[in-house]
């Protein structure tokens, strides 16, 4: 029994080393990719069109003040405002949106557990952009906590929710790379093949063959 444990330990250590090497190589892309998507979507589309609350509404007005700080990348100051909106207007759309902003702020500040906590509380509306982007951000937050199984689960869910050329390939490739880092090449290959077969009008389609080739070897 002791010998079996001793044999298992090096395997586990090798897996941890491979995972660390993966994040060392891809961390900037993992952190930046989805967060950038969310910032663009939230800033340009969501606040003006998705929630459709009057600017005179107090909750929306308070949210807008924090959004200005967010747009200036003053995430620590914006975070305080969003947390206040979430606390004061928890039952409103503005309060719900504040949770998403809180999660993104925490991610930008490198506070990944806090980001997870906030993003878990955000309630999507079944759309094909904001809700899956938030789900993808949650997956990335879990990845940065080295909880890769949960990360892959949420990224795959995000890709399915979006089912479009803009977001799905990004999430599928991220999930695939994480699976590769765990030695699960067969599972990763399926995700890459899904990008090739379903999202041939996406930007990622141009480079998907290299992922397929890597996972096939």
List where the protein language model places each region:
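N-terminal positive-inside, membrane-proximal cytosolic segments immediately preceding the first
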Residues: 1-36
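Short solvent-exposed coil/turn linkers within tandem alpha-helical repeat scaffolds
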Residues: 53, 86-95, 124-132, 159-168, ...
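TPR-repeat structural position
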Residues: 75-76, 112, 148, 185
């Amino acid at each position: 029994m002791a010998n079996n444990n001793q044999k298992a330990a090096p395997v586990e250590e090798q897996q941890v080393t491979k995972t660390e090497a993966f994040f060392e190589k891809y961390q900037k892309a993992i952190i930046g990719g989805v967060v950038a998507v969310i910032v663009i979507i939230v800033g340009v589309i969501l606040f003006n069109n998705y929630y459709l609350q009057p600017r005179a509404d107090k909750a929306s007005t308070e949210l807008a003040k924090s959004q200005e700080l967010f747009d200036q990348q003053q995430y620590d100051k914006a975070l305080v405002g969003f947390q206040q909106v979430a606390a004061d207007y928890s039952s409103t759309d503005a309060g719900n949106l504040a949770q998403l902003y809180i999660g993104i702020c925490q991610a930008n500040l490198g506070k990944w557990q806090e980001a997870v906590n906030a993003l878990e509380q955000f309630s999507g509306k079944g759309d094909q952009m904001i809700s899956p982007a938030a789900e993808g951000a949650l997956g990335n937050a879990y990845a940065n906590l080295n909880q890769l199984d949960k990360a892959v689960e949420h990224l795959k869910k995000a890709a399915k929710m979006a089912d479009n050329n803009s977001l799905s390939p990004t999430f599928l490739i991220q999930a695939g790379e994480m699976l590769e880092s765990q030695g699960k090449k067969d599972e990763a290959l399926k995700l890459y093949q899904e990008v090739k077969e379903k999202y041939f009008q996406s930007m990622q389609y141009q480079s998907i063959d290299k992922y397929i080739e890597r996972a096939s070897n």
